[in-house]
């Protein structure tokens, strides 16, 4: 479930299938599952979606994961909806990391892509998290043709992280069963961004086994980092150690 209408994901918004009678996992089921994963040695849980904060019991789930399990890290991926209003709650609940989707730093472009004029709320929310000394902030953007795929757009994101200790990652658009036309029209190979980074002296960085599929780059003149998630690269799935559990279990 998501409350945005991103052109590459849910352009018509979330619509419940009347023929699907399956229910979402309850708080009790999620709590029991979290404890089981903890006993099995899982070291990190990421709450994602859709948009995880649309659940009315989201903060109860987050607090339960932090207080009643031995999972060292609990993080989330969010579209940033009302981030400026919930940033303090996220910090108080013990969230260890946050990934925020921002496909454009241009207000009108962001509104066109998502169906929401909320870029200013997200940026304000990031500032609040930083004031709270929240350290693990990442921004994701889907690489899209004629929207954010030019050196000028890359430079805007670079300026955003120049004095911000934030990881900014581009994600190459993936083809799925129901987006073939959109993919053909909007796909941009990740190589275009990688070439830009190499040309501008960004240096590849290696991470540990739990770091995920992002190829990260650092630069001596920047506090933040750039990253690239390229699902069509040769070794994308080679070290995958993730288990994805759907909202219905």
What residues fall within each predicted segment?
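Accessory C-terminal segments flanking Radical SAM cores
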Residues: 175-248
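Conserved radical SAM core fold
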Residues: 15-16, 52-54, 80-85, 101-117, ...
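Glycine-rich beta-strand-to-loop/alpha-helix junction loops that act as flexible
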Residues: 47-51, 77-79, 249
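Generic structural signal for well-ordered alpha-helices
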Residues: 34, 62, 87, 126, ...
